[in-house]
């Protein structure tokens, strides 16, 4: 049986003959015109009879076989690919930054496919980052409104309390005890309401901050050196895969 393969442009697919002896595989005869994709035509024959012809794109096949990140689907041009878990094939390689971002967003420490537990270090994010972006839109509005109210009510309550106490002292000097007691009671009620509102708001936002801090930690992946797949090795694997697929024989 004889198998031959030629590469041409999609507009022209002439016959490709081979003078190789029976049982041998003819090497590829390929050409790339104007940088366009190569189309491979595989012809299989036995004892002079045509068995099958297959046309496929060579460049697409070789591109799909190259290692890429399973999250962003990019190669190792910008960042080296890692193989930190027990996943194999196209799901076995991933960028370090992509994995750290996914572990931080999902608040997990294991692979969702093979359930391999990663070795990670979690560091809490600073308070300033939470103040800039506390979470959902309604939490942003609540935080902004409470901060404005606190900045406005605090000096107002302080001045009102001071004026009430000053008036109570003046009424005591003029023997007006009833008015003095009323002003003192008003001052106590004013500060009680102010402190109650401040404590409730502060406790509410502390709970939101603790929840945000727990679910939005900075994740640092700790990977042994043996798990790191260098970019040169990735390129070599892609080249071997390219050659292996180019020499397939379809009968």
From Swiss-Prot:
TM region positions: 143-163, 180-200
PROSITE patterns: ZF_RING_CH
Keywords noted in UniProt: Cytoplasmic vesicle, Endocytosis, Endosome, Membrane, Metal-binding, Transferase, Transmembrane, Transmembrane helix, Ubl conjugation pathway, Zinc, Zinc-finger
Enzyme Commission number(s): 2.3.2.27
Binding site for Zn(2+) 2: 85, 87, 111, 114
GO molecular function, one term: transferase activity
Location of this chain's protein in the cell: Cytoplasmic vesicle membrane; Early endosome membrane
Family matches, as Pfam families: RINGv
Lipid bilayer topology: Multi-pass membrane protein
Cellular component annotations (GO), alphabetically ordered: early endosome membrane; endosome; lysosome
Protein name per the record: E3 ubiquitin-protein ligase MARCHF3
Organism: Xenopus tropicalis (Western clawed frog)
Lineage, uppermost ranks: Eukaryota, Metazoa, Chordata, Craniata, Vertebrata
Gene name per UniProt: marchf3
């Amino acid at each position: 049986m004889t198998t031959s393969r030629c590469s041409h442009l999609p507009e022209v697919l002439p016959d490709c003959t081979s003078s190789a002896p029976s049982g041998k595989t003819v090497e590829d005869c390929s050409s790339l015109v104007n940088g366009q994709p190569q189309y491979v035509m595989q012809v299989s024959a036995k004892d002079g009879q045509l068995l099958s012809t297959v046309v496929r794109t060579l460049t697409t096949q070789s591109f799909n076989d190259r290692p890429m990140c399973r999250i962003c689907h990019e190669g190792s041009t910008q960042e080296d690919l890692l193989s930190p878990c027990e996943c194999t094939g196209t799901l076995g390689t991933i960028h370090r930054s992509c994995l750290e971002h996914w572990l931080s967003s999902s608040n997990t420490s294991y692979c969702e496919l093979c359930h391999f537990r990663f070795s990670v270090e979690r560091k809490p994010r600073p308070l300033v980052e939470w103040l800039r972006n506390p979470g959902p839109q309604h939490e942003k509005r609540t935080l902004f409104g409470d901060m404005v109210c606190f900045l406005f009510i605090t000096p107002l309550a302080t001045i009102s309390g001071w004026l009430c106490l000053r008036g109570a002292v003046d009424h005591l000097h003029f023997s007006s005890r009833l008015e003095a007691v009323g002003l003192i009671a008003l001052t106590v009620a004013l500060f009680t309401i102010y402190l109650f509102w401040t404590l409730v708001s502060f406790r509410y936002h502390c709970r939101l901050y603790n929840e945000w801090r727990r679910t939005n930690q900075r994740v640092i992946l700790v990977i042994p050196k043996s798990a790191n797949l260098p970019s040169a090795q990735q390129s070599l694997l892609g080249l071997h895969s390219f050659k292996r697929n180019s020499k397939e024989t379809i009968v």
